[in-house]
A protein has these predicted regions:
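Intrinsically disordered, low-complexity regulatory regions enriched in serine/threonine/proline
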Residues: 2-21, 32-44, 48-150
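Short glycine-rich hinge loops at helix-strand junctions in the catalytic core
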Residues: 29
Length: 150
């Protein structure tokens, strides 16, 4: 998928907030460096700049991951948001049903979070000290919340 086709795909198939996030990335020194898969059933778009932002669509559900630098392991966005907040994972993302009232999965994860509003601050924060440890703490907290019989 060339950049023009990718642009059309975002405009026609992604939520408005995803479109705004991609526009912000492109306006702030990030470029589409790779793409795999096609269509809303499964595709990944990698944007490189000072950090690496990976946008994935899987069965019409949009996800975001961030790597501190291009090529590094990426962290899931919910973990970054919880870690950056300084609060526990459960405080940032209280338990909620994984499906909407009508049975549909949310279009964009984490549910209720605007990527466009939060990503600039996360990208500025992610290069700072102690980020890895904070993300690992959030990961442990999320795991404990998801464990059956907790």
């Amino acid at each position: 998928m060339n950049p023009l086709v990718a642009d059309e795909f975002f405009r026609s198939d992604s939520p408005v907030d995803v479109q705004a996030t991609v526009a912000w990335l492109l306006a702030n020194g990030y470029g589409l460096s790779s793409q795999s898969g096609e269509g809303a059933f499964g595709a990944r778009f990698v944007f490189r700049g000072p950090a690496e932002v990976r946008i994935t669509v899987d069965r019409s559900q949009w996800l975001l991951d961030v790597a501190v630098e291009p090529g590094a392991d990426a962290w899931q966005y919910d973990l970054l948001l919880a870690a950056r907040s300084g609060r526990t994972y459960g405080e940032v993302f209280p338990a909620r049903a994984s499906r909407q009232a009508d049975g549909r999965l949310p279009d964009q994860l984490p549910e209720g979070v605007s990527w466009r509003q939060t990503l600039p601050d996360v990208l500025a924060w992610v290069r700072g000290p102690g980020v890895g440890e904070a993300v690992e703490r959030a990961s442990r907290e999320r795991f404990a919340l998801m464990r059956p019989g907790r």
